Design a protein with these regions (language model features):
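Conserved catalytic cores of phosphodiester-cleaving nucleases, focusing on short active-site segments
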Residues: 34, 53-75, 91
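Catalytic cores of nucleic-acid endonucleases
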Residues: 11-12, 70-120
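Acidic-basic catalytic patches of nuclease active cores, encompassing PD-(D/E)XK
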Residues: 1-44
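Structural motif
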Residues: 50, 63-65, 108, 125
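Residues at secondary-structure transition points
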Residues: 17, 21, 25, 50, ...
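Short acidic/glycine-enriched loop/turn segments that link adjacent beta-strands
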Residues: 48-51, 121
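Domain-level recognition of nuclease-like catalytic cores that cleave nucleotide substrates
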Residues: 101-153
Length: 153
């Protein structure tokens, strides 16, 4: 039986291809792209309970909560199509938790999406700014001025 974790002489052992591995590689590419644009990465894979933020970055004075979606370029779903209404709700709750944990309620914030398409080991990244608008999340959330700072009251 073939052991996918065995070390082959003269070659690095590699983990089998997995969704988690592809996602992690996409997040690496996304972080590198943002740093290359002069952004400062404040947190990666930040968690609060079951909530997670892929990347929390700073562009100028603005905090940016970045969701990263990585997909096969030849697949049926494009990366941006994976950002559903349910995912947007979870991102908002995660951002509120991050703002509370870091006493950053007075900071301007926004949500961006980095789409990573993979084809034959090549990664193509695209940044989409402001993927969550005030109209997307409705009025039942305490979000202050839409794209500005989210306030808990």
């Amino acid at each position: 039986m073939l052991n996918p974790f065995r070390r082959v002489q003269g070659e690095r052992a590699r983990a089998p291809h997995s969704k988690a591995g592809t996602g992690a590689a996409g997040e690496e590419r996304a972080a590198a792209m943002l740093c290359g644009m002069g952004w400062r990465i404040l947190a990666r894979n930040w968690r609060s309970g079951h909530l997670e933020l892929d990347i929390v970055a700073q562009e100028g004075d603005t905090l940016v909560f970045v969701e990263v979606k990585t997909r096969d370029a030849d697949g049926m779903q494009r990366p941006y199509e994976a950002l559903t209404a349910v995912k947007k709700e979870r991102l908002l709750r995660a951002a509120q938790a991050w703002l509370a944990a870091n006493d950053a309620w007075n900071r301007p914030c926004r949500f961006d999406l980095v789409c990573v398409a993979v084809r034959s080991g090549t990664y193509q990244t695209e940044l989409i700014r402001n993927v969550i608008e005030f109209a997307d999340i409705g009025t039942r959330h305490a979000v202050g001025g839409g794209n500005a700072s989210w306030q808990p009251w």
